[in-house]
Swiss-Prot record:
It comes from Salmonella typhimurium (strain LT2 / SGSC1412 / ATCC 700720). This is 3-deoxy-manno-octulosonate cytidylyltransferase. The keyword Nucleotidyltransferase applies. It is an enzyme of class 2 (transferase). Pfam families: CTP_transf_3. The gene is kdsB. Keywords: Cytoplasm, Lipopolysaccharide biosynthesis, Nucleotidyltransferase, Transferase.
């Protein structure tokens, strides 16, 4: 099947300045992400960035760059600018791969594209089971609850669903009901255009989760269990050292 990968790579980062260009074992991080995307079999891969240094690093690795504005409030807004500049048709399948995921398995990039293509829905994503209490109660691990058909009912930083009987006895173990959302999305290009036309929702501001805008406006997001679990993403200097060690 045919799909396009867009990798948003914003240069500024509060916790890790110049994050796309940090060195991981001899290569800029954004180049590692580009290589994972190439392994997925995508028809086209575009790095969307607001900084010339990132563009030069990507082009030196043979990648395609789309320069975007620096004032976007979300990765989806940056994608929308690329969609318009490249003139993608509304039915083009777009996969948003985060620029700080150098260990993302190529198989799940393709999985989310295929998941979307098989359904009459504008957006799809992935999740993995949560097995530890530490992760279940960590607000940085976004949880998702699904309906009987695998569509998202809600995403939250809170522990959902709340296992009343289990947690009344102990908060040290979790059952098999919690899913952690992965930050990879598949969209049809026309859906991205619609998304950015909607006003931000109260829920996305409360939780700081942009996907809640989709549910707020009554649209569906299909969620599949990922075929592979991604490695560590890079948000902090500690994450960076961990990834360097894991990728040696």
């Amino acid at each position: 099947m045919s799909f396009v990968v867009i990798i948003p790579a914003r240069f500024s980062s509060t916790r890790l300045p110049g994050k796309p260009l940090v060195d991981i074992n001899g290569k800029p991080m954004i180049v590692h992400v580009l290589e994972r995307a190439r392994e997925s079999g995508a028809e086209r891969i575009i790095v969307a960035t607001d900084h010339e240094d990132v563009a030069r690093a990507v082009e030196a690795a043979g990648g395609e760059v789309c320069m975007t504005r620096a004032d976007h409030q979300s990765g989806t807004e940056r994608l929308a600018e690329v969609v318009e500049k490249c003139g993608f048709s509304d039915d083009t399948v777009i996969v948003n791969v985060q620029g700080d995921e150098p260990m993302i398995p190529a198989v799940i990039i393709r999985q989310v594209a295929e998941n979307l293509a098989q359904r009459q829905v504008g957006m799809a994503t992935l999740a993995v089971p949560i097995h530890s209490a530490e992760e279940a109660f960590n607000p940085n691990a976004v949880k998702v609850v699904l309906d009987a058909e695998g569509y998202a009912l809600y995403f939250s930083r809170a522990t959902i669903p709340w296992d009343r009987d289990r947690f009344a006895k102990s908060l040290e173990t979790v059952g098999d009901t919690c899913l952690r959302h992965l930050g990879i999305y598949g969209y049809r290009a026309g859906f991205i255009r619609r998304y950015v036309s909607w006003q931000p929702s109260p829920l996305e501001h409360i939780e700081m989760l942009e996907q809640l805008r989709v549910l707020w406006y009554g649209e569906k997001i299909h969620v599949a269990v990922a075929k592979a679990v991604p490695g560590t993403g890079v948000d902090t200097a500690d994450d960076l050292e961990r990834v360097r060690a894991e990728m040696r």
